[in-house]
Amino acid sequence: RQGVDVSMITAAAGARVMSNALETREKAAGLLEVDAVPPVQDRKAFAEQIRRALYAAKIVAYAQGFSLLRDASERYHWSLDLGTIAAIFRAGCIIQADFLNDITAAFRRDPLLGNLLLDRFFHEKIAANHQSLRSAAASGIRTGLPLPAMTNALSYLDAFRSPHTGANLIQAQR
């Protein structure tokens, strides 16, 4: 209803629903076989790539969540202080990640920040890690490993940084 892209949150919810369908997935596994996946050659490098990919995806997830809060605050005239919200999460929420300190700092630098990805700290982190996200998502797709949140993070980044989205193609088909 807010008109904010929260595709990672939606993908995570969908993955949770799918995880509950064990019996159906077991039946499908016997019917819809995929080719064997070759083993990873360099486990240490692969683990580092996954760590970096997850970090980039986490930034996108928080960017989407805080964009949703920003939009709701503007739409409903709530005057939410997003930096304070991040600090509250850090102090007493189940999340309590050190990463929330970086979010608090971003909103302290710019209280009107529309998206975390526009903050220098976060766009530098994305620049340093987005290729790992792209490689990890591609590996998952190649091997048939479902990575809905990770692939949505990559799609979001690609759409967010592009002045022209696929909507132009949809409009051309009308």
What do the predicted segments below correspond to?
Residues R1-R174:
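NAD(P)-dependent dehydrogenase/reductase Rossmann-like domain
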